[in-house]
Amino acid sequence: MAGLGPTFPLHRLVWANRHRELEAALHSRKHDIEQEDPQGRTPLELAVTLGNLESVRVLLRHNANVGKESHQGWAVLQEAVSTGDPEMVQLVLQYRDFQRATQRLAGIPELLNKLRQAPDFYVEMKWEFTSWVPLVSKMCPSDVYRVWKRGESLRVDTSLLGFEHMTWQRGRRSFIFRGQEAGALVMEVDHDRQVVHTETLAPALHEPEALLAAMRPSEEHVASRLTSPIVSTHLDTRNVAFERNKCGIWGWRSEKMESVSGYEAKVYSATNVELVTRTRTEHLSDQDKLRNKGGKTPFQSFLGMAQQHSSHTLAPVQQAASPTNPTAISAEEYFDPSFSLESRNIGRPIEMSSKVQRFKATLWLSEEHPLSLGDQVTPIIDLMAISNAHFAKLRDFITLRLPPGFPVKIEIPLFHVLNARITFSNLCGCDEPVSSVCVPNSSSAISASGSPFPCEVDPTVFEVPEGYSVLGAERSEPLRDEDDDLLQFAIQQSLLEAGTEAEQVTVWEALTNTRPGIHPPPRVTVFEEQLQLEQALQESLQLSTESRGPESPQKTPPSPAPPSFEEQLRLALELSSREQEELERRGQQEEDDLQRILQLSLTEH
């Protein structure tokens, strides 16, 4: 290793791709494998960016962290995709899934142990997807997650499984988590097919070599990533501020209070919440760029999923450069903390488009609600957020420093025309009785458990229903993150946190080796829905045109050819915007009139 310099020895070996010496240095355990160089890269990030496959292989064998994000918010896997090297992507993807599975094996029992220490309860979480666009709001579904918690056992029922091929997927499913001494048991109950899939989560049951081998992705899997844009979407809450909502008219305004599920709640607005979406395409061929740009349906374009393509201004490429070092940066320049690279960088020149949108989230907080956000609700959201993008966004939001109180209702943006509204209700069956939940006499129960709102949950709700077939019980098949069949959809929807690679899948698809969307809806269903949407647009446009004037039909010139679907969608959006502006204008005018009347009445006295 002589001549490589005293600082950043692992990085310098990676720079030169001297992988045998790198192996020896890592075996000595004298160096920090996660140390960052002056540009903020770990040895693994540097090796991937430079395309040094042999060094990447050595670092991954020594358990370098694949989940780390760069200071710019890009994951190691995303940087691997940007190289365009299929072998690099396959290797990084395999180790990423391996490290995720290992973390889940240890993490889920820990979350269940947290639940064990909290009082038992039953609660319902109503998810409503809302939009300010009328046509979209009609297509938005709602779902109620029913949650039972007893000891370290948890059951979550849902009927909304996901969103695939532009249709919402329905089905009655239960996800049951049961803590055990050596780990945890996870069951997915498909009530429609009366089938139960089981998986035992225990590190002792999975040999690392077998687990790693099972994580090897298919060639199609790798190819789909290499022919799709790299997308990072995240909520930026660094500048978020919480303000109390006001109600009343001028001169008599007060802080807003609302009753939610029987609890008085203070209403807050969270301002300066930004949704940042970035898309990279430098790894795509011209054909792939055209396909991804033109492959979006008119409805997807209407929802704002089409991004404008732009390239970053880069330093000129030099003759002595390589594809992964286009500006011929030397090792001395790169590793010198006092040397400024300015616009020069290593790796492929980045082609990136970005969109920043500002939103206002709303919170209804009740200080008298008996549930504990940290002890009872957060572990559940953590369990569901392992693989569900909606829960992941909810988790990121509730981990902020919220004002005091339990969030009985939350409204957060998912992307710029779609919000999610989550309401906690029917706590312990107090609003609507639940057969599996019993609330004892308050006096004796409170003294026994110390909980302000205790309830008893029937243990049979965590058992396999009678007559159901059990598949995969105690199987040795490892966990697998099978989110990639949904990757293209997730990119188009911008409903994922690609910075941490939390794409949208159901819990069981992320915990087991089950492929998502095994039975996708037939294409005719999607086509029929688009026809229905187009028909609705035509009717709404026709009605709006007829209402504009009393022109007789005899004087009407021959009607031109019907507008395209894209044009109809554009017109519908314009009409929706006009109607919204008109409503706001009328509301403002009414408030101004009220203020004038009040001022006049005050001056008369």
Curated annotation (Swiss-Prot):
Primary localization: membrane
Domain called UIM: residue spans: 482-501, 528-547, 564-583, 589-605
A Pfam family reported for this protein in Swiss-Prot or TrEMBL: Ank_2
Biased composition (Low complexity): 538-554, 564-575
Sites bearing Phosphoserine, chain numbering: S552
GO MF term list: ubiquitin-modified protein reader activity
Region (Disordered): 538-605
Keywords for the protein's UniProt record, in alphabetical order: Cell membrane, Endosome, Membrane, Phosphoprotein, Repeat
Annotated compartments: Cell membrane; Late endosome
Start-end of Basic and acidic residues biased regions: 576-589
Biological process according to GO: negative regulation of receptor internalization
Residue numbers carrying Phosphothreonine: T556
Cited function: Ubiquitin-binding protein that specifically recognizes and binds 'Lys-63'-linked ubiquitin. Does not bind 'Lys-48'-linked ubiquitin. Positively regulates the internalization of ligand-activated EGFR by binding to the Ub moiety of ubiquitinated EGFR at the cell membrane.
Subunit structure: Interacts with EGFR (ubiquitinated); the interaction is direct and may regulate EGFR internalization.
Protein name per its UniProtKB record: Ankyrin repeat domain-containing protein 13D
Organism from which the protein derives: Mus musculus
Highest classification ranks of the organism: Eukaryota, Metazoa, Chordata, Craniata, Vertebrata
Protein's gene: Ankrd13d
